């Protein structure tokens, strides 16, 4: 059986990327951002095509993402932050609600969002994951921006032409 295949496309040239970074657990979040921005540049995204905004914490990230999505100015968005377990239920609340909010914005506004909000048990775990997670978010945002653009062009794929 023959089938179509869309290969992974990590070409970032010409893409506009919005980044929302939480400031809570700032050293971790800054390391995430540095790795993410470096990878975006490595993959061809121009500095002037990246907009970074910061918010107090992970729970504020979805609203900023929503405002960016509403603008229609971005091909993909990236959420960066760190939620580190403490001694209360707050960890679960922040982790679950920020993740659900990010997913809702993604689906409501039909825009790719790379979720780089780390959820770890310790500071050491968070620091150990910053570099790879930051780079992964850049790659995910670019890949999904290119994929969604390609899929937008598939409106009639697989449908028989009624005029034949």
UniProtKB/Swiss-Prot annotation:
Record key words, sorted: Riboflavin biosynthesis, Transferase
Catalytic class of the enzyme: transferase
InterPro entries, sorted: LS, LS/RS, LS/RS_sf
UniProt keyword annotation of Transferase present: yes
Enzyme Commission code(s) on record: 2.5.1.78
Active site per the UniProt annotation: 90
A GO CC term attached to the entry: cytosol
A Pfam entry, by short name: DMRL_synthase
Catalytic activity: (2S)-2-hydroxy-3-oxobutyl phosphate + 5-amino-6-(D-ribitylamino)uracil = 6,7-dimethyl-8-(1-D-ribityl)lumazine + phosphate + 2 H2O + H(+)
Family affiliation: Belongs to the DMRL synthase family.
Protein name: 6,7-dimethyl-8-ribityllumazine synthase
């Amino acid at each position: 059986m023959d089938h179509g295949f869309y290969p992974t496309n990590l070409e970032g040239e010409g893409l506009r990327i919005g980044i929302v970074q939480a400031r809570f657990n700032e050293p971790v979040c800054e390391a995430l951002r540095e790795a993410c921005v470096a990878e975006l540049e490595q993959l061809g995204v121009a500095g002037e095509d990246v907009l970074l905004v910061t918010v107090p914490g992970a729970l504020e990230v979805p609203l900023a993402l929503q405002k960016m999505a509403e603008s229609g100015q971005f091909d993909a968005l990236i959420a960066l932050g760190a939620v580190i377990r403490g001694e209360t239920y707050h960890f679960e609340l922040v982790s679950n609600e920020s993740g659900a909010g990010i997913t809702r914005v993604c689906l409501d506004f039909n825009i790719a969002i790379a979720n780089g909000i780390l959820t770890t048990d310790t500071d050491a775990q968070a620091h150990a994951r910053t570099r790879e997670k930051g780079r992964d978010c850049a790659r995910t945002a670019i890949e999904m921006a290119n994929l969604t653009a390609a899929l937008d062009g598939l409106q009639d794929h697989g449908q028989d032409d009624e005029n034949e």
